[in-house]
Amino acid sequence: GGGQAQEVLESAINYSVANGSVTIAASGNINNNMDFYPASYDQCIAVGAMSPCCERKQGVNSCDAEPGWGSTYGDQIDFVAPGVRIFATAKRAGYWTDFNGTSSACPHVAGIAGLMLSKNPYLNPETIRELLRQGADDIGDLGYDIETGYGKVNAYESILLVPSPVSGDINLDGTVNISDVVILVDEILFGSYITTGDINADGINNISDIMLLIQIILI
């Protein structure tokens, strides 16, 4: 990442999110209030690094013994996650290492998003962002702040908030009704594929899914 926005990258991210991908990016390790891309793009979930003392990782003022860097902050920050001496596997003796930075904080959030999707694969990116917000622990100034965003991500609380999928709820409004049938018919006629419309889980949207959906509504 860096301090310069790139239109082609932003367009790619917007396209990816519009098609259901969750985009999560590290805020950078410059220890200033500044834009850092791609984290500063609106469609990205921007993740900063937290020190072991549950505050934004700073430089010489940090509570840990890592004075050489700090987590970049600003109004683009959504969340913080642990970012100091995070363990990881490595192709070396012992097969492990540890590393610092917002690049070590970011995977925590990506992992939580993956767990949320494993509970309900029909969640869209904005719903995942909102449930992460609701589940986060507010560790900075009350409410949102530019140093820690909405707070420290909390896997347990965010996953608890994930609703179980409802078979046939194509528009994800919590109910199964004629609106879902209309959407499924439209998707089939225009030859596209929507995961929530694949009622029989055979990898395609077709008349069989419509028949099953109608049965669900009538039961």
Residue ranges of predicted features:
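Carbohydrate-associated surface elements
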Residues: 50
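A glycine-rich, coil/turn loop motif that links secondary-structure elements
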Residues: 100-102, 144-151, 169-175, 197-205
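Alpha-helical metal-binding/catalytic segments enriched in His/Glu/Asp
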Residues: 112-120
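Short, well-structured alpha-helical segments that form the helix of a local strand-helix-strand
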Residues: 125-138
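Low-complexity, Pro/Thr/Ser/Gly/Ala-rich linker/spacer regions in secreted
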Residues: 156-169
